[in-house]
Design a protein with these regions (language model features):
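Pre-active-site segment of Zn-dependent metallo-hydrolases
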Residues: 8-48, 53-60, 83, 114-130, ...
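Active-site environment of divalent metal-dependent phosphoester hydrolases
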Residues: 22-23, 49-53, 73-76, 94-96, ...
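Active-site neighborhood of phospho(di)ester-bond hydrolases with catalytic His/Asp-centered motifs
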Residues: 16-17, 39-47, 67-70, 147-153, ...
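Glycine/small-residue-rich loop that forms an oxyanion/phosphate-binding "nest" at active or ligand-binding sites
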Residues: 53-56, 61, 67-70, 79-94, ...
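Active-site-proximal loop/helix segments of hydrolase catalytic cores
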Residues: 119-192
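Extracytoplasmic
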Residues: 1, 9, 132-134
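Beta-strand-turn-beta hairpins that frame and shape the catalytic cleft
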Residues: 8-14, 95-106, 140-147, 240
Length: 240
C-alpha cells in the first residue's frame, strides 16, 4: 500500500504509513511489527486506516514519536490513543529537525485527499473523528538525498512547485485510481511536473477498487522521461 521504511546514511530509521498486520499484501515475515527492527520515528500522512493502522502500536513499542498532520494528532491525543509526547504535530510547509541541524529533516507538503479517523468509543462503537488535513513528506537525508512520499493524493498543479523547491531524487506516488491518482495522471505528474531520478508506484492492488497497475504507469510514462521506475515487491529494499 504505502508502508515505507527508510534508513538514512546516519542510521536513523523512519517508517511511513505503517499498515502491516492486516494488509493482505504483507509477506508473512513482516506480519509482526518486530520484523521492522529498530524504528526511530514514524510519519503518518493522514488518518485513514490503511495508513494509520499500526502507527500507534509501533510508536509505543519503540517509544518513537508518531508525527502527523496537526489536526490528526490533536485527535489522537484527545482520544488517548497516544500521549502528546508521542504524537507531535506539524503542518504543511513546516520542517522538523528531529535530530538537530545536521540530521535528516522532514517537511510536510500538500496532498489532495481526505482524512478521517475511525476509532471505537468506550462502548465499542465505531466513531468517525476529525483527521486533520492530509500531507505528503519530503525527507532529506544527512547527505542531501531527498525522498518525496506523497501519501494519498490526486494530481494538482503545485506538484510542479514542490518539485522545483525540493528537487526530490525519489518520488513514491499512488497509482491505484478510484481514491487516488490513476496511473496516467501519476505518469503525467512525473514526466511533466516533477522529473525525479526515480519513481516508485504505491497504493495499488490491495482492494478491487485500486485497479491501477505499475504496467499502466510505466506505459503511460513512456520513454525519454529521464525517470527510472522501480517496482519493489512487498518487503524488497533498494539502496541509493
Amino acid at each position: 500500500q504505502a508502508t515505507t521504511r527508510i534508513t538514512t546514511p546516519g542510521g536513523k530509521v523512519i517508517v511511513i504509513d505503517p499498515w502491516l498486520k492486516t494488509n493482505p499484501k504483507t509477506p508473512a515475515a513482516f506480519k509482526e511489527l518486530s520484523a521492522l527492527g529498530k524504528v526511530d520515528l514514524i510519519l503518518v500522512t493522514h488518518a485513514h486506516f490503511d495508513h494509520f493502522a499500526d502507527a500507534p502500536e509501533l510508536a509505543k513499542i519503540h517509544n518513537a514519536p508518531m508525527y502527523g498532520p496537526a489536526g490528526m494528532n490533536q485527535t489522537v491525543a484527545a482520544l488517548g490513543i497516544l500521549p502528546g509526547n508521542l504524537a507531535p504535530r506539524f503542518g504543511k510547509g513546516g520542517t522538523i529537525l528531529p535530530w538537530g541541524p545536521t540530521g535528516p529533516k522532514i517537511t510536510a507538503v500538500r496532498a489532495e485527499h481526505s482524512s478521517e479517523l475511525g476509532w471505537k468509543d468506550a462502548a465499542g462503537k465505531d466513531v468517525v473523528h476529525p483527521g486533520g488535513e492530509p500531507v505528503g513528506y519530503i525527507v532529506e537525508m544527512e547527505n542531501g538525498f531527498k525522498v518525496w512520499h506523497m501519501g494519498d493524493t490526486g494530481v494538482f498543479g503545485d506538484m510542479r512547485l514542490i518539485g522545483e523547491m525540493y528537487r526530490p531524487d525519489v518520488v513514491l506516488l499512488p497509482i491505484g485510481n478510484h481514491f487516488v491518482m490513476s496511473p496516467q495522471d501519476a505518469a503525467m505528474a512525473v514526466r511533466d511536473m516533477i522529473r525525479p531520478r526515480y519513481a516508485i508506484p504505491i497504493h495499488y492492488g490491495t482492494t478491487p477498487q485500486l485497479r491501477g497497475t505499475p504496467e499502466e504507469f510505466i506505459g503511460a510514462l513512456g520513454t525519454g522521461s529521464g525517470t527510472t521506475v522501480l517496482v519493489p515487491q512487498p518487503g524488497q529494499k533498494y539502496d541509493f
